[in-house]
C-alpha cells in the first residue's frame, strides 16, 4: 500500500503534519528544507524589481509569450505554490524554446496541482488561447467514458493501418514531473505498479523498469511505438522533467501489448490503448474499461487522480488539460496529402497531422499520424467521435481523388458551448 506519510509531505499539509506528528528530525528536516528554498527564492527576488527579471520574448511564438505581460509578471513573480514552485519555473521551457515551425507550443508547464490556481492570471489566458476559446474562468469540462455511444468506429483498413487512444493521469498529493523530488517520483512509480498488479483478464500484464532494460530493448520498444522516446525533447529537458533519468521510469503493458501505462515521463502516468488495424471502437472500449479499472485500483489504495470541474484532469502541460485524450490513427493518404486543401480540411475537422513517427518526423510512404486537436471542453466520447468522423472523411476524399473526382472542404465544426 502506498505510504500515507509521503502524501502528507506536501506544502499544503505541512502545518497539519507538525501538529499531528510533532517535529521529529525527519519531518522537520524535510519541511524546513522546502521552506528554506522558498525563503531563499523570495529574498533573491527582492534584490531586483520585476521589470529587471522580465524575460525577453520579442522573438517568441508560443502561447505563454503571447499572453504574458509585464503587469501579469509583476503580480505573479514572487508568488509560490505550497511546494515552492514559482512562475519563472513554469515559463522557463517557453523562454528557452521560442517556438515550433509547425505547431504553436504552449510554452509553460505546471509543477503541481496548485500551479493552475496560484498562477491562474497567466494559465487561464494560455488555456483559452490554446484550446479554441475554452475559458476556464466560466466554463466547466464534461467527462464521458461510455464507449457504447461511439458510432462508425471501424475504418477501411486499406487506408488506416493502426488506431490508438491515450490520456494522462496525475496522482493527487505528489508534485508533477517538473518539480517532483526523487522520493516523490519513486512514490508515483510505487503507487502505480501496486495498483496495476490488480488488473485481471485481458488487461493483466507486467511492469518493466527503464533502468533494468538494455539499450536494445528500449530502442525496440520505441521503434514499435510502445515506449516513450529518450529525454531529448526541449519540453522535458528545459522544464526539468528529465532529471535523474531513468530513475523510477518504466512501462507497464498487458500481455497482448494493446493496453499500456507509461510511468514518470511527461506526466505521472500515460494510459494507452492501441492495436494494428482500423477498429477504433474496440480500441476506445478497451481504453475506457482499462482506465476505469486503473482509477478504481488507485482509489482502493487511498489515492486519487487530480481533477476539478473547470480544468478536468490535471496534467503537466496545459495542452493536455481536460480529457488529456489524443485519439489517433496512422493513415495512408498519398493523393490527399499533396492536395493544397489538405490543411484547411484538417483545420475544419479539428484534426492535426504529424509525421509517421510523431512530432518532428517525416511522413514515411505517405502515412500520417492524424489526431484530434482539442482536449478540453468536449468529452472523451465527443473527441473520439470527431476523429472517427474526420478520418472517414479523409479516406473518402482519398478515394474520390483516386477516381479523379473533386473533393470539398467541409464546414468548420461548431464551437463547443459548455457553461
UniProtKB/Swiss-Prot annotation:
Chain ranges passing through the membrane: none
Coiled-coil segments on the chain, per record: none
Reactions it catalyzes: creatine + ATP = N-phosphocreatine + ADP + H(+)
Endpoints of the signal sequence: none
Modified residues (Phosphotyrosine): 255
Taxonomy, superkingdom: Eukaryota
Subunit (UniProt): Exists as an octamer composed of four CKMT2 homodimers.
Other known facts: Mitochondrial creatine kinase binds cardiolipin.
Family: Belongs to the ATP:guanido phosphotransferase family.
The protein's name: Creatine kinase S-type, mitochondrial
Organism: Mus musculus
